[in-house]
Amino acid sequence: MKKSVLTAFITVVCATSSVMAADDNAITDGSVTFNGKVIAPACTLVAATKDSVVTLPDVSATKLQTNGQVSGVQIDVPIELKDCDTTVTKNATFTFNGTADTTQITAFANQASSDAATNVALQMYMNDGTTAITPDTETGNILLQDGDQTLTFKVDYIATGKATSGNVNAVTNFHINYY
């Protein structure tokens, strides 16, 4: 009986020691690593400009009779930037992505889905109104200014042949390249 009591006592002591040892080995410390980055963006795009709609005026098909003829009704396409910091970068270019017309490859194809005008595309220009912006091609250099500014591009109808009446629609997604 003494052996049984001694064996039971040793078993209890060992079990208690194991539990105590397990508690002593519990992981109670750790670490968390935080990573981040403070940036100095060149400019911030004004939200209202990000997804804008430009409505062109109606134009007579008689103004678009031959390939390459423009209507002469250029409309401003403003893109507003704010908080520009020229200590970060002084220059930008834009890339206007979209479907190029197959005849006038520097113009955006008419993508109207119903009652579409034929032989008409949309030509974008730099602010000077003469330098064409080709789809998916970087524009020329634009000098940035400190603070807020509006960069103005232009758009006009351009004939790809003898135009017929109907709807004209094109979409371009743009990317600003700072350098």
From Swiss-Prot:
Part of the elfADCG-ycbUVF fimbrial operon, which promotes adhesion of bacteria to different abiotic surfaces. ElfA is the major fimbrial subunit produced by this operon. The operon is cryptic under classical laboratory conditions, but is functional when constitutively expressed. The keyword Signal applies. It is found in: Fimbrium. Keywords: Fimbrium, Signal. It holds the Pfam family Fimbrial. It comes from Escherichia coli (strain K12). Its main location: other. Induction: Expression is negatively regulated by H-NS and subjected to cAMP receptor protein (CRP)-mediated catabolite repression. GO terms for biological process: cell adhesion involved in single-species biofilm formation. It comes from the Bacteria. Gene3D superfamilies: Fimbrial-type adhesion domain (2.60.40.1090). Belongs to the fimbrial protein family. One of its GO terms (cellular component) is pilus. Disulfide bonds: none annotated. Residues 1-21 form the signal peptide. This is Fimbrial subunit ElfA.
